[in-house]
Structure formats: structure tokens, C-alpha cells
Swiss-Prot record:
This is Lipoprotein signal peptidase. It comes from Trichormus variabilis (strain ATCC 29413 / PCC 7937) (Anabaena variabilis). One of its GO terms (cellular component) is plasma membrane. The active site is at 116, 132. It holds the Pfam family Peptidase_A8. PROSITE patterns: SPASE_II (PS00855). This protein specifically catalyzes the removal of signal peptides from prolipoproteins.
């Protein structure tokens, strides 16, 4: 049996591994609330915890967010295992979303919160983590995939 949707699994593994590794580094290196200016006033590493979703949305809703993360993860795994062979951009997008959902989901189940540390101060944006980034990049990949697919109506002769 050939391994189906290989790019999906590679993207999911890399996203999950990078997310967990960077969070581990932050927790081991910084005290809660500590910040390290990388580009002062523009970009910092700031260790905070988040009981909400990506970019601090739905703060304090960790209970249903942990189940949402699990549900999304199981749905994507089912799609990759039981569904058709996906196009490359779809595999990449869904894989990155799975890796990010699993990374934040594990934090929510194990800790009750998510570790965030990427702090773009220039635009006064919420502190976030690599899982949030991978989910966002995955969504962009899916948008690109949908733009590349031409509707059947374009192929009809007029």
C-alpha cells in the first residue's frame, strides 16, 4: 500500500514539531511575562499564556476550544486517511492546519492554556505562537488552492 497524501503528513509533523519545540524553549528560557526585544519596539519574544484561540480571540473559553482542536484534528486526519488524494496546495494547507491544531490542542488539554511568545509591537498585535502561524499559513495555502481550481463553467463553450 502506498502512503497517501504524503505532503499532508510531512507538513503536519513539521508544524507540530516546530510549534512544540519553540514553546518548550520559551517555557525553559523565560519567566512568565518576560520579554526579549529582538527588534526593539517592533518585534519581541514575550512569554504569555492564552486561554483563548488564535491571537487571543475567545479568551477564557479553553474548555470548548480544546474539544474544537481535537475535532478539527480528527476531521483532518480522517480526510487524509479516508478521503481522496489531495492536490499539493490542499495537502500543504490541511497539514499545516493539523499541525497547528494539534500543537495548541495538546497545550489546552495538558496545561489548560496555550503558550504564546511572538510579539509584533509595531502593529500592536496580539501575542501568538507558531501553531497560530501555521494555521494562518495553512488557510492561505487553501485559498491559493481554490484560486488555482477553475470552475467547470469556464470550460464550457459559449
Amino acid at each position: 500500500m502506498r502512503f497517501k497524501n504524503r505532503l499532508f503528513w510531512i507538513a503536519a509533523f513539521i508544524a507540530f514539531f516546530v510549534d512544540q519545540l519553540t514553546k518548550y524553549w520559551v517555557v525553559q528560557t523565560f519567566s512568565l511575562g518576560e520579554t526579549l526585544p529582538i527588534l526593539p519596539g517592533i518585534f519581541h519574544f514575550t512569554y504569555v499564556t492564552n486561554t483563548g484561540a488564535a491571537f487571543s480571540l475567545f479568551s477564557g473559553k479553553v474548555e470548548w476550544l480544546r474539544w474544537l482542536s481535537l475535532g478539527v484534528s480528527l476531521l483532518l486526519i480522517g480526510l487524509a486517511l479516508l478521503g481522496p488524494v489531495l492536490e499539493r496546495w490542499d495537502q500543504l494547507g490541511y497539514g499545516l492546519i493539523l499541525g497547528g491544531a494539534m500543537g495548541n490542542g495538546i497545550d489546552r488539554f495538558a496545561l489548560g492554556y496555550v503558550v504564546d511568545f511572538l510579539d509584533f509591537r509595531l502593529i500592536n498585535f496580539a501575542v501568538f505562537n507558531m501553531a497560530d502561524s501555521f494555521i494562518s499559513i495553512g488557510i492561505v495555502c487553501l485559498l491559493l488552492a481554490s484560486l488555482q481550481k477553475s470552475p467547470d463553467s469556464h470550460h464550457r463553450s459559449r
